[in-house]
Structure formats: structure tokens, C-alpha cells
Amino acid sequence: MNQANNVLDSIYQPDLEIMNQPEIELDDLLIEEDEDLLLADDGDIDEFLEPQTDEDDAKSGKAAKSRRRTQSKKKHYTEDSIRLYLQEIGRIRLLRADEEIELARKIADLLELERVRERLSEKLERDPRDSEWAEAVQLPLPAFRYRLHIGRRAKDKMVQSNLRLVVSIAKKYMNRGLSFQDLIQEGSLGLIRAAEKFDHEKGYKFSTYATWWIRQAITRAIADQSRTIRLPVHLYETISRIKKTTKLLSQEMGRKPTEEEIATRMEMTIEKLRFIAKSAQLPISLETPIGKEEDSRLGDFIESDGETPEDQVSKNLLREDLEKVLDSLSPRERDVLRLRYGLDDGRMKTLEEIGQIFNVTRERIRQIEAKALRKLRHPNRNSVLKEYIR
């Protein structure tokens, strides 16, 4: 995983077996049903809305009254918008397994068309016209446009039918710096990406696959947008050293080290250690209750040093996408990057070592590497990998 991330860093510098199912009428599947709707329970909607608070009665004057009216209107507008949205998505029928598979097939067909378009755009050095695109996939223009239309409708249907999953996941991340409305918006972007990446032939349900993408989008947005106090870089480095030292001492002593022991190993005073811990809001106990109901523990939200199932999914997805991008390079360019970044054996080789393998000079290997990285920075290629950049 580290080797793959090294490639990403270089690119972005400066700049279940599936059962046979009968075919489904897509026109029936891709329309909004008017009957047999699943209605949302209005009684559950209020739990997603932030509680209203009374204005301080001590405030007086026109300015305070005007401010209260503006805030009240804005709050009611937001709550009404969320309420309406939840009611609307509650009316969307959930997909059956066979419908999910059929939609996934149509989306895969759409993505194949879009890959052809990307290659054509790179070749022409401009956006291709529909007629050129249709010719590239060997279809008459009307048939091509219908196929494209069906694929896009299938993607929209897959996303719309799983919006309740976004709400369910977003609810778990409330009161962490982003409004519920923003959490839904970020989660929906993750859902769209999941629909674009889903491979139904691998045998898992779309909801299982989409959950990872939704969580990733939400947690990344929280990390990027919700921190109001940003610490200096050097302080982050010290915090990281404290964590590593604490872990090392725990392994050496077979118990949790004291503040004095950590400070001694770090060669700093206890006062400084406590100050840094307070600045970073490091928890004294991972059992500290979190949230209004105090039904969660701080430890639930601390990243583990071990590889979680989500980490494994991310690792596999990155490997697959990186392989696809590397396949677009020439064999020599691909081999040079594999050796340079240790993608096969985990060992990064020097320019001299690679030059000896190919019987060329160090400078020639540097040129090949630079050319390969320039190609990977092309928008048609780096768009595939950009989602992994934090």
C-alpha cells in the first residue's frame, strides 16, 4: 500500500457467485413508480434535525430582533428542506437483487463507453463529437445515443434507490462539525462514485460496497472541513512521536506507561507533554463517552494501527485502479515505475540499479520515469487515482 501511495505522491506533485437472472425491461425499471411507494415515517425525521434553542431574552433592540428573525427563517428553511428531502427519498422503492444486477450491467456498459471517449479525447487532443464517439464503438449514431441514455438512467436509478443508505450512515456522523445536510451531500458523492466503480460480477451486494465509499466521503469531508483550529505542522509531528513512544513503551513494559515515563523517553517536561496533549485534544481514556446520548466511546473513532476491513478494501481498489492506469503506459515505462517504486516486491530501486537491469544509463532511466509520470498526470488518467489522494 505504501508503494502504491508513493506512486500517487509522484503523480500529484505540483500540480458470491452471481445467479443467472432473466432480462428486465429497463423502461419499466428506470421510471419512477407512482404506486406501491414506501413512505418515510415522519416521526423519525425529527431526530435528524438539530434542536432549536431560544434566543437570549436579554437581547433587545431592532438589530437583535432582526437577527433572530433571519436566523429563525434560515433554520426553518433548512429543517423544511431536510424534511422534504427525507420524505422524497422515502418514496423511492428499494431495488430487488435482480434489478440491482441489471442496473450494474448497464452502468458497466456506460463506463466502457466513457473509457472509449477518454482514449479518443487523448488521441484527438479535444473532446470528441458524438458522431466520432459512435464510430469508435462501431454503432450507428441513434443506437449509440440510446445506449448512452440507458446507461446514464441506470446510474441515476442505482444512486436514487440507495439514498436512504446515505442518510443511515450520515446519521452516525452527526455532531462532529458538519451539518446533517452537508453530511448527506458528501455521502451522496461517495454513493455516486460507488455506482461508477461497482463490479456486480465479484458477488457482493451494492449496499455493502457503497457503504465503504459513503463512509470514506463523509469522514474525509469531516477531516477537511470541520477542524476550526489548525495546529502547526511541527506540533502534529510531535504528537505523532508521542503516540509512537507511548506504543513502544507499552510493548516494552507490558502495561500503559505513565506521563512521567513518556516525558522521560521524549526528553521533555511533563508540563510540555500535557500542554501538547491538551492542544491536540488527545484523550486520556478511549472510554470517554461521546455524543448527546453518550452511547459511543471515543475509542470507536480512533484510527487503529492494524488494517481494518475498510483499509483492505481501499488497498485492493487502489491496486486495481493503479494497474489499469499503468497498463496505459508502454511496457518499458511500466516496468521502470514498478521497479522504481517497489510495486512488486516492496523494495524501491535506485536509478543506477534499474539502469543496470535494462543496460542503459542512469539518466536514461530518469528520462523514462519522468515521461511516464507526465503521462500519468494527464487528466484522463489521474482522474482515476485522484480520489485516493487525501
Curated annotation (Swiss-Prot):
DNA-binding region(s), chain positions: 351-370
Primary location class: cytoplasm
Region of interest: Disordered: 48-75
A GO-annotated cellular component: cytoplasm
Signal peptide: none
Location of the motif Interaction with polymerase core subunit RpoC: 182-185
Region of interest (Sigma-70 factor domain-2), ranges: 158-228
Subcellular location: Cytoplasm
Annotated region (Sigma-70 factor domain-4), positions in chain: 325-378
Bias-annotated ranges (Basic residues): 62-75
Ranges where the record places region Sigma-70 factor domain-3: 237-312
Function: Sigma factors are initiation factors that promote the attachment of RNA polymerase to specific initiation sites and are then released. This sigma factor is the primary sigma factor during exponential growth.
PANTHER family linked: RNA POLYMERASE SIGMA FACTOR RPO, RNA POLYMERASE SIGMA FACTOR SIGA
Protein's recorded name: RNA polymerase sigma factor SigA
Gene symbol of the encoding locus: sigA
